[in-house]
Amino acid sequence: MLIRIALFRAVGERGSSLKPGTMKQPASLDAIDRRIVSALQDDGTLSNADLAQTVGASSASCWRRVKALEAAGVLTRTVRLVDPGAVGRGVNVLCNVRMRSHAIEARQDFERFVDGRPEIIESFSMSGEWDYLLRIVVTDVGDYNHFLMQVMLGHPSVAGASSHFALSMTKYTTAIPV
């Protein structure tokens, strides 16, 4: 079985003071900076020499630019992407969550709960009818049923949930357009 693993520079970092998707002043990027960011999103293992050749800059200039992009928070950590099916987590569930209360303490308690659950790999605070949208990866429907009934709905901040099972993933990328 072939496992596709890619390395990339992630935008945002778990536990950072500014989470991905949080509004902040965008960095001023010129054409070379944009090519660097795009190249590193495709392959974070590129050596500085290969990156410089790819983007059409000198090695020294490329190194300085990467360091500046890191300092500006444009480039953060380097991670490996894992095929969820290859590790037995091939079922994707999108779960809408409604909170019992919108008090800051209830939201913070729920967000701490989410941070502590490894099967919840993405979480968004939402506007509209539902308060949160979670992406959850599990082994099978029974695994999700246990998580939903015994864990999620048992949390004191949760009033209700609506689950949607992905039949297939038709697009997946971690690359942010620059």
Please provide the spans of the model-predicted regions.
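A compositional/biophysical signature of low hydrophobicity enriched in polar/charged and small residues
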Residues: 1-178
